[in-house]
């Protein structure tokens, strides 16, 4: 028994129509239609080959159908990781090396490592035992089970065979059959099945009368606001506010006794840079007197009154020096003693010799 795949079936096709079409080349054991594709089981292999040769691209209800041998789902394989591969190694050489231990489904080299899909798990175990840590083209390669979860099934490794349709010469990602087994070019059937595409919205952006009316009203409102808030109106309002503020401030000032100053303040042509010196007041006179006293005291304390640097001349007594009319209260002896102290040389005096004399005064 040979299983055939029929793709791109029209919606009008029925199982009886497909069965009668394939019975022209041999006995049909089973016929199933699933949406726009189906499967036909023919008893004889030769009859299946004749049906493929004659019915492939056969036009049925105006649609070309595809007839080919059905490919079973890929069996679970064992994926091996091969590391430290020589840069001169090719896929064919690596495949031949692993085929010594069993059938190889796919061999893919990525830079200095590769992935090899073995058909049977026991063959993969034997390949690991025989090839791990062995020399291959001048480098010691490492073979172990792959732990990668990406693309665990074979396919898309090279163009030697597509795991979707089984044909050679194209990548699996370029296969016309999608992952569900359907032919990828089904645009017409898709439109017929799910309905035509909705016509685009043809009304232009400016066709809405409501939009135009609304925009015009907003434009008119903007123009009115702009005219009301012109520069001249704003300047006039500012000048009026300033005049009111100046009048209110002047009315709150106290009455000025000086008529000349009052007339100057109330005049309209005020000069902010016009400054006049104020007449001297009582406080200013007091300050001038204090300055004169300070100058007199400075000249008084600046005179030299040291007895050691006194100029030569007649020595005045205490009574004569004070001149306050108290000569009778001071004795002549005390005056003579004090004068004798001033006449002594500095180096002849002792520090504590005349303490009794100082205590008498």
From Swiss-Prot:
User: Where on the chain is Phosphoserine found, per UniProt?
Assistant: 86, 306
Give cross-link positions for Glycyl lysine isopeptide (Lys-Gly) (interchain with G-Cter in SUMO2): 79
Q: In which tissues is it expressed?
A: Expressed in the suprachiasmatic nucleus (SCN). Expressed in myocytes; expression gradually increases during muscle cell differentiation (at protein level). Expressed in the suprachiasmatic nucleus (SCN).
- Any GO molecular function: cyclin binding
Q: Name one GO cellular component term.
A: nucleus
One Pfam family matching this protein = zf-CCHC
Classify the main location. Answer: nucleus
InterPro entries tied to this protein: Euk_RNA-bind_prot, Nucleotide-bd_a/b_plait_sf, RBD_domain_sf, RBM4_RRM1, RBM4_RRM2, RRM_dom, Znf_CCHC
Q: Which domain of life is it from?
A: Eukaryota
What the entry says about post-translational processing? Phosphorylated. Phosphorylated in vitro on Ser-306 by SRPK1. Phosphorylation on Ser-306 is induced upon cell stress signaling, which alters its subcellular localization and may modulate its activity on IRES-mediated mRNA translation. Phosphorylated. Phosphorylation on Ser-306 is induced upon cell muscle differentiation.
What triggers its expression? Answer: Accumulates according to a circadian rhythm in the SCN.
Question: Region Interaction with TNPO3: which residues?
Answer: 196-361
Keyword annotations of the record: Activator, Cytoplasm, Differentiation, Isopeptide bond, Metal-binding, mRNA processing, mRNA splicing, Nucleus, Phosphoprotein, Repeat, RNA-binding, RNA-mediated gene silencing, Ubl conjugation, Zinc, Zinc-finger
| Compartments it resides in | Nucleus; Nucleus, Nucleolus; Nucleus speckle; Cytoplasm
Where in the chain are the CCHC-type zinc fingers? 160-177
Function description: RNA-binding factor involved in multiple aspects of cellular processes like alternative splicing of pre-mRNA and translation regulation. Modulates alternative 5'-splice site and exon selection. Acts as a muscle cell differentiation-promoting factor. Activates exon skipping of the PTB pre-mRNA during muscle cell differentiation. Antagonizes the activity of the splicing factor PTBP1 to modulate muscle cell-specific exon selection of alpha tropomyosin. Binds to intronic pyrimidine-rich sequence of the TPM1 and MAPT pre-mRNAs.
Against PANTHER family, the record matches this protein to: HETEROGENEOUS NUCLEAR RIBONUCLEOPROTEIN M-RELATED, OS02G0815200 PROTEIN
| UniProt protein name | RNA-binding protein 4
Specify the species: Mus musculus (Mouse)
